[in-house]
């Protein structure tokens, strides 16, 4: 089979397709049509495998975009649905029942002791690490401000909206989201010595990777307790605003990806870590007045590192969404509070949803739903 392009340029044609309802070609919908597909020895009627995607990174993955404005009550996402001609906002408002999400994360001044979480029990830091899968809906983003309802959402929403049509109700897709605002690969990106993505550390007070692998394993255990066999089809990443311009970004990212695959190889397709996809996205390259971390040289170096990983010649399963304003990308915008982009670094409401749709379309186009 012809290899898929590693660097994904999703422009206006993609958006037109998505706004009409993203989907894989009907003739290519079977799991044996893709380069990464695997044959199962389990008869279809006895097959209890379910697809799992682990979402991680920093605040734009954690979900720092308003679906409803907490100050003036503007229904930003609902308005976008109407403007785009989509008449099913209630799906994302009430929950998509065949794509289930659990989430955990924090913004570094609060640390792991005060993480926002899907867990109904927030009495202790350990209790906050308890997974709680729910139909994917608005309000699964960061909320450390006591807002009720939670006004934020992340890429999980667009992913679920895009893939749900291709998911059996009795074999839901599970999204495990574990992401941390402001996080980078070295302690310097987190104030006051708070944790970073250094996977050599093994303490929740120091290592975000420790929290990621702990929360992921707990979530997989829950899926197994529900009678399913979880298969991690992809590691979905959005990070780089913290760490832009660091000369070792590519090395650090490769190590984190390799460590994650090694940690969860048992749950990979055919228990082969090389069959676990990696879905990344470039960081913002537009003209909004963001800091030096992701502008000019820092921004370019970080995106170049992402493209290098996505274009590995011996790997069919590394992908990078081109969200850039240049080079024919999606042109996603950030930082306009009136349009839903909380403070300086975060996607506006339409673009945060489009980002999720782009991840979802990658999943469909590359046959990652077995």
What are these regions (language model features)?
Residues 28-44:
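N-terminal, intrinsically disordered, polar/charged segments of Gram-positive cell-envelope systems
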Residues 23-25:
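Bacterial signal peptide processing site
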Residues 42-370:
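Cell-envelope and extracellular/periplasmic
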Residues 10-15:
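Hydrophobic helical h-region of N-terminal Sec-dependent signal peptides
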Residues 18-21:
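C-terminal motif of bacterial Sec signal peptides marking the signal peptidase cleavage site
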Residues 1-9:
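Bacterial N-terminal signal peptides that target proteins for export
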């Amino acid at each position: 089979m012809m290899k898929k392009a590693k660097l994904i340029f999703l422009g206006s044609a993609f958006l037109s397709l998505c706004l009409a309802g993203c989907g894989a070609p009907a003739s290519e919908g079977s799991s044996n049509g893709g380069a990464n597909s695997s044959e199962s020895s389990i008869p279809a009627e006895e097959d209890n495998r379910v697809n799992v995607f682990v979402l991680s990174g920093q605040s734009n993955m954690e979900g720092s975009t308003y679906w409803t404005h907490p100050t003036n009550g503007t229904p930003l996402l609902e308005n976008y649905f109407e403007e785009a001609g989509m008449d099913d906002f209630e799906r994302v408002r009430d929950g998509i029942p065949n794509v289930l999400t659990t989430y955990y994360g924090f913004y570094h001044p609060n640390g792991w002791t005060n993480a926002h979480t899907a867990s109904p029990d927030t009495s202790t830091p350990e209790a906050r690490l308890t997974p709680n899968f729910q139909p994917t809906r608005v309000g699964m983003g960061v909320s450390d401000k006591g807002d009720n309802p939670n006004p934020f959402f992340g890429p999980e929403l667009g992913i679920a909206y895009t893939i749900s049509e291709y998911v059996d109700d009795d074999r839901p897709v599970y999204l495990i989201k574990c992401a941390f605002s402001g996080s980078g690969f070295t302690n310097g990106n987190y104030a006051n010595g708070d944790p970073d993505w250094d996977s050599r550390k093994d303490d929740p007070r120091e290592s975000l990777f420790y929290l990621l692998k702990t929360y992921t394993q707990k979530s997989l255990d829950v899926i197994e307790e529900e009678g399913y066999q979880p298969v991690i089809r992809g590691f979905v990443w959005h990070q780089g605003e913290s760490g832009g311009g660091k000369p070792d970004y590519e090395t650090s990212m490769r190590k984190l990806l390799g460590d994650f695959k090694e940690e969860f190889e048992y749950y990979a397709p055919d228990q082969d870590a090389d069959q676990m996809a990696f879905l990344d996205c470039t960081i913002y390259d537009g003209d909004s007045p963001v800091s030096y971390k992701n502008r000019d040289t820092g921004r370019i170096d970080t995106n170049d590192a992402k493209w290098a990983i996505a274009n590995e010649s011996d790997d069919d399963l590394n992908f990078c969404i081109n969200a850039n304003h240049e080079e024919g990308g999606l042109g996603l915008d950030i930082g306009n509070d009136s349009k839903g982009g909380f403070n300086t670094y975060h996607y506006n409401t339409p673009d945060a949803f489009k980002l999720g749709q782009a991840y979802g379309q990658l999943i469909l186009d590359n046959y990652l739903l077995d």
